[in-house]
């Protein structure tokens, strides 16, 4: 029984590593937005929706990893 509990905790810890990738992805998206806006300020209205879409996709990846972690801890 203790081995199964340890495996749950290890699996949950490993699955939360994906949230690190989501954080890095969000940082890259907004760094590119700031870089593009500083190079050409007139493109702000064009670049911003793409940045929000990239943010949403990166955040969804992190939320899926967090959901897997909670499922391993409390659902199985």
Swiss-Prot record:
InterPro entries: ATP_synth_F0_csu, ATP_synth_F0_csu_sf, ATPase_proteolipid_c-like_dom, F/V-ATP_Csub_sf
Quaternary data: F-type ATPases have 2 components, CF(1) - the catalytic core - and CF(0) - the membrane proton channel. CF(1) has five subunits: alpha(3), beta(3), gamma(1), delta(1), epsilon(1). CF(0) has three main subunits: a, b and c.
A Pfam cross-reference name: ATP-synt_C
Protein name: ATP synthase subunit 9, mitochondrial
Record-marked site positions (Reversibly protonated during proton transport): 59
GO terms of biological process kind: proton motive force-driven ATP synthesis
Matching CDD domains: ATP-synt_Fo_c_ATP5G3
One GO term describing the cellular component: proton-transporting two-sector ATPase complex, proton-transporting domain
Membrane topology: Multi-pass membrane protein
Keyword line: CF(0), Hydrogen ion transport, Ion transport, Lipid-binding, Membrane, Mitochondrion, Transmembrane, Transmembrane helix, Transport
GO molecular function, one term: proton transmembrane transporter activity
Places the protein is found: Mitochondrion membrane
Entry similarity comment: Belongs to the ATPase C chain family.
TM ranges: 14-34, 48-68
Membrane is among the record's keywords: yes
Keyword Mitochondrion: yes
Its biological purpose: Mitochondrial membrane ATP synthase (F(1)F(0) ATP synthase or Complex V) produces ATP from ADP in the presence of a proton gradient across the membrane which is generated by electron transport complexes of the respiratory chain. F-type ATPases consist of two structural domains, F(1) - containing the extramembraneous catalytic core and F(0) - containing the membrane proton channel, linked together by a central stalk and a peripheral stalk. During catalysis, ATP synthesis in the catalytic domain of F(1) is coupled via a rotary mechanism of the central stalk subunits to proton translocation.
């Amino acid at each position: 029984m203790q081995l199964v509990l340890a495996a749950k905790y290890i699996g949950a810890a490993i699955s939360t590593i994906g949230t690190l990738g989501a954080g890095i992805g969000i940082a890259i998206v907004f760094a590119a937005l700031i870089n593009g806006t500083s190079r050409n300020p007139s493109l702000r209205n064009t670049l911003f929706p793409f940045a929000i879409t990239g943010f949403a996709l990166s955040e969804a990846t992190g939320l899926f990893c967090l959901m897997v972690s909670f499922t391993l801890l409390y659902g199985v």
